[in-house]
C-alpha cells in the first residue's frame, strides 16, 4: 500500500503449460526479484530421489530477475535458469516461452475482481487470486477430460 492506495503486484509461478502452481502478492513499490525466493522456497527441495518430482527443472524469467545473488541461489538449488541478462540479451529471445506466462496472467486478469483491485485488504485480494488460479486449473482439467 502506498499512501493509502491499494497497489499490488501479482507474482505467478506456472508450469510449462501455463497452469498456475503458486501465486503471491506484494506491494507495488517492491522489486519483482524479492518475491522469487519465497515462491520457490515452498517447493520441496529435499532428498535427491524426490527432487525431480517436486522442484522446477528450469526457470524462465525476464531481466528484472537478473541479479547475481539470485542466480547463485538458483544454481545452489540446482534449478536451471534462463534469465535474460541486462545489457546483453534482448527480451525478444524470451518470446518463445514468455507467451505461456503472459497467457496465464491474461486468464487471471480476465476475472473482474482481479482486473481492478476493489479490495482494501491484501488478504482478500490474495484469496480471489487463489480462487481464480484454482478455476484456471479446473477449466484446463475439464478440457483435458472432455
Question: Residues of each region from the PLM?
Answer:
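Basic, amphipathic alpha-helical segments enriched in Lys/Arg and hydrophobic/aromatic residues
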Residues: 68-73, 77-81, 91-93, 97-146
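Polybasic low-complexity intrinsically disordered regions
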Residues: 1-86, 93, 132, 146
